[in-house]
Curated annotation (Swiss-Prot):
GO terms for molecular function: ATP binding; ATP hydrolysis activity; four-way junction DNA binding; four-way junction helicase activity. This is Holliday junction branch migration complex subunit RuvB. One of its GO terms (biological process) is DNA recombination. Belongs to the RuvB family. Keywords: ATP-binding, Cytoplasm, DNA damage, DNA recombination, DNA repair, DNA-binding, Hydrolase, Nucleotide-binding.
Length: 334
């Protein structure tokens, strides 16, 4: 799969950069107003009662700030954040080691929690519900179960695929919050804030131009800002102006809707070779040289969100909006 500027996934290097850009409290966090307002109430109530915050599940598309919110929850509660991920916990013993190392009140953040193995989930149930850990010592007839008490803690789980969570795990979260895509105005505020952190001057039209092409996702907005900053430093006087931002984004092949060259290849392939569809996923895969699951999981969600493709029983079709975007005449069916 080609590297994409508009991908909502983060690589390891980018995760380090994101950490330096993260707001430290709810007041600094831009967007997600309903989620913030509710978390403010839950956090304040827990602090007033001198209790740990109830377990929190954050779900929604990647790149919207789930990890940042987990860090903010820990900061607001005045406790430490311990971070891991579903794929990193391979055995029940791995989870037991993490849980027994927690201090009272700590926040344990598990990213991609939907990827936990079922046997590991079963260890997590009593830990979440009763703050205890059941460990089996020995094997065969002589095996016995020992219960270890754990300090009270808050589990913050994050997932992009909440439907893959088992019902027993999902039901143990007292707070469930869905993160939504951001508005252009919110993304422009994020771009402006990030530019301040980078000590780069940017005007409002430029921030809006970057926001418009960021697919509703802060991670994409910050990535595009970093690349536009490169153009401003090399081709200009380090200030990000509207001309610089438009020129940079055109050279980066990110159009005004946030579509990149791969999106264009997919959509134009459907139009030119299949008259706009319907066409099956495997056929699209063979046509553009990408895996079917990559198309379905990576490329399609945004195209579906903006109404550029539709899924039908007979396959995918492009909508009239695609022809309008590419300034083409839509076919007429008599």
């Amino acid at each position: 799969m080609d590297e994409r500027l508009v991908s909502s996934e983060a690589d390891n290097h980018e995760s380090v950069i994101e950490q330096s850009l993260r707001p430290q409290n709810l007041a600094q966090y831009i967007g997600q107003h309903k989620v913030k307002e509710n978390l403010r109430v839950f956090i304040d109530a827990a602090k007033m009662r001198q209790e740990t915050l109830d377990h929190v599940l954050l779900y929604g598309p990647p790149g919207l700030g789930k990890t940042t919110l987990a860090s903010i929850v820990a900061n607001e509660m005045g406790v430490e954040l311990r971070t891991t991920s579903g794929p990193a916990i391979e055995r029940p013993g791995d989870l037991a080691a993490i849980l027994t190392a927690l201090e009272p009140g700590d926040v344990l953040f598990i990213d991609e929690i939907h990827r936990l193995h079922r046997s590991i989930e079963e260890v997590l149930y009593p830990a979440m519900e009763d703050f205890c850990l059941d460990i089996v010592i020995g094997k065969g007839p002589s095996a016995r179960s020992v219960r270890l008490d754990l300090p009270p803690f808050t589990l913050v789980g994050a997932t992009t695929r909440v439907g893959l969570l088992t019902a027993p795990l999902r039901d143990r979260f007292g707070v469930m919050s869905r993160l939504e895509y951001y508005t252009q105005e919110e993304l422009a505020d994020i771009v402006t804030r990030t530019a301040d952190v980078f000590e780069v001057e940017i005007d409002k039209p430029s921030a809006l131009e970057i926001a418009r092409r960021s697919r509703g996702t802060p991670r994409v907005a910050n990535r595009l800002l970093r690349r536009v900053r490169d153009f401003a430093q090399v081709l200009g006087d380090s200030r990000i102006t509207e001309d610089i931002s438009q020129n940079a984004l055109e050279r980066l092949q990110v159009d005004r809707l946030g579509l990149d060259h791969i999106d264009h290849k997919l959509l134009m392939g459907m139009i030119e070779k299949f008259n706009g569809g319907p066409v099956g996923l495997d056929t699209i895969s063979a046509t553009i040289g990408e895996e079917s699951h990559t198309i379905e999981d990576v490329y399609e969600p945004y195209l579906l969100q903006i109404g550029f493709i539709q899924r039908t029983p007979r396959g995918r079709i492009v909508t009239p909006a695609v022809y309008h975007h590419f300034q083409m005449e839509a076919p007429r069916y008599d």
